[in-house]
């Protein structure tokens, strides 16, 4: 299973660098994300002038994880001090998948660093492994 964060999801909606790589990688994947994705994606779509039905269509392919008490408690305890609130909630949601989690799909440097600190594999189609630890990319 792959966990998709908002930075990756938006690449599905808007053609930008690595969008085609991501679409190809997700073509036959089982994809999960936090219920946060619903709100974040719709808010971003409004800013970008994209119709809500486009977001809803892409969200249909994603199983959303409810933000329960356990997930919120886990988000408080993530190791990375630089991880912001919503990214900590994404990471905690991904960790809810346990051993079934193959990788967190993200193009967000802080989240990628937080994932590796927690022992989660990071996958960013089109980017080289370890891109998040480089000073330039």
Over which residues does each language-model region extend?
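Short, well-structured N-terminal submotif of metal-dependent ribonuclease cores
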Residues: 1-33, 45-57, 130-135
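A general structural signal for well-ordered alpha-helical segments in protein cores
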Residues: 19, 38, 52-55, 72, ...
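Alpha-helical scaffold domains
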Residues: 54-55, 63-64, 69, 73, ...
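Alpha-helix capping/helix-boundary segments
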Residues: 8-9, 37, 71, 90, ...
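Acidic, PIN/NYN-like endoribonuclease modules and their adjacent C-terminal/linker elements
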Residues: 34, 96-137
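Short active-site oxyanion
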Residues: 28-31, 61-63, 98-103
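Acidic catalytic patch
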Residues: 61-81, 87-93
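Short beta-strand scaffold positions
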Residues: 4, 33, 66, 85-88, ...
């Amino acid at each position: 299973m792959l966990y998709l964060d908002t930075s990756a999801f938006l690449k599905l909606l808007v053609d930008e660098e690595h969008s085609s790589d991501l679409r190809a990688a997700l073509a036959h994947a089982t994809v999960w994300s936090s219920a946060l994705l619903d709100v974040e994606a719709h808010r971003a779509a409004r800013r970008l002038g994209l119709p809500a039905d486009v977001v809803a269509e892409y969200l249909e392919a994603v199983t959303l994880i409810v933000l329960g008490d356990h997930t919120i408690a886990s988000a408080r305890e993530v190791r990375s001090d630089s991880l912001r609130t919503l990214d900590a909630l994404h990471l905690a949601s991904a960790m809810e998948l346990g051993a079934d989690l193959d990788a967190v799909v993200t193009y967000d440097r802080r989240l990628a660093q937080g994932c590796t600190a927690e022992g989660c594999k990071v996958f960013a189609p089109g980017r080289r492994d370890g891109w998040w630890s480089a000073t330039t990319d």
